[in-house]
Amino acid sequence: MANEFLFTSESVSEGHPDKVADQISDGVLDAILAEDPKARVACETLVSTGLVVISGEITTSAHPNYREIAQDVVRRIGYDNSDIGFDYKSCAVLAAINRQSSDIAQGVNEGEGLDLDQGAGDQGLMFGYATNETPSLMPLPIYYAHRIMQRQAEVRKDGRLPWLRPDAKSQLTVKYVDGKPVAIDTVVVSTQHNPEVSHAQISEAVIEEIIKPVLPKELMQGEVRYLINPTGRFVIGGPHGDCGLTGRKIIVDTYGGAAHHGGGAFSGKDPSKVDRSAAYAGRYVAKNVVAAGLADKCEVQVAYAIGVAKPVSLMVNTFGTGKIADDKIVDLIRAHFDLRPKAIIQTLDLLRPIYSRTAAYGHFGRDEPEFTWEQTDKASALRAAAGL
């Protein structure tokens, strides 16, 4: 008897208040890395009505203009008029920045602390995941939830749907049979809009101009339920409608709930923070395992102690889809991937101003050149070593 279930993932637009905060934090990080690649950055942002607050611990020789960075991000997203509740020209920007703790720094700096290699910036556990249910080796629900949000921004910015505003959310429910996605069951889109447009206009335009062009037709052969702005009205939105904070969309940023999450957010953190760099490395490892054909699905957990370079643990789960035993895959990972922080940074070339692009529409499953952790350059070596 077939095993059937529904699985749901959500995404949010670049204009969602939490994503505005993420993009400002990563905008600060990129501005600093462009001048000082060895900087230590932990940048948190809060956005509310007419206000941006930037805080955190930053040690750098660079001199970022926090106000200019924040305003540029807000402008690029599309908050350019006080009529929509947030305007880059008039929002206040407050910055309260401290230096990184010297106690932490000595454990991370190479040649200092008890471990003379570059240690992990904190303790913690991180997960990477890949599945062969999409060409990008991402779970299908989160992959297409992101594509819906990217399409919303595209038709908003190019003028096809000029009544759209920046804040939006999507949610995709997919039917699975025996672990494979077979049909889209429900699509939810809530999008901010001008007050003049009717709900009927919004529904028709969102379905025809945003949803249908991006979802795979072969998964929409049955009856799909569309829920468009189900409250009936979404005029007040963005930072005016909800306070936004860095790091509050960690499931949107990763696998949409299809895999575990260690709890650490990404945006605003330089790659000495394993919350970010080791999660990217975990995706790199898992994607190469699946690309090599060693498993249909692969989840990798890696854990660190602060100030210690080598991971304290490494675990693999292929959910019964492995072509070889999971412990053998662990052995292959240890042989082919160096998961010490310095090695991750070097392998994935992470000391570059590449992070603003990651701060909306997911950190994984993207084919832009900045996303080095999406490479499958180890797949052939893994397959050969596995004897497949």
Swiss-Prot record:
Subunit structure: Homotetramer; dimer of dimers.
Source species of the chain: Azoarcus sp. (strain BH72)
Subcellular localization: Cytoplasm
Function noted in UniProt: Catalyzes the formation of S-adenosylmethionine (AdoMet) from methionine and ATP. The overall synthetic reaction is composed of two sequential steps, AdoMet formation and the subsequent tripolyphosphate hydrolysis which occurs prior to release of AdoMet from the enzyme.
UniProt cross-references to InterPro entries, sorted A to Z: ADOMET_SYNTHASE_CS, S-AdoMet_synt_C, S-AdoMet_synt_central, S-AdoMet_synt_N, S-AdoMet_synthetase, S-AdoMet_synthetase_sfam
Keywords associated with the record: ATP-binding, Cytoplasm, Magnesium, Metal-binding, Nucleotide-binding, One-carbon metabolism, Potassium, Transferase
Chain sites annotated for binding K(+): 44
Cofactor: Mg(2+); K(+)
Positions of Mg(2+) binding: 18
Single annotated GO MF: magnesium ion binding
Organism lineage string: Bacteria, Pseudomonadati, Pseudomonadota, Betaproteobacteria, Rhodocyclales
Protein name: S-adenosylmethionine synthase
Gene Ontology terms: cellular component: cytoplasm
Gene3D superfamilies, sorted: 3.30.300.10
Positions with a binding annotation for L-methionine: 57, 100, 242, 273
Reactions catalysed according to its record: L-methionine + ATP + H2O = S-adenosyl-L-methionine + phosphate + diphosphate
A Pfam family recorded for this sequence: S-AdoMet_synt_N
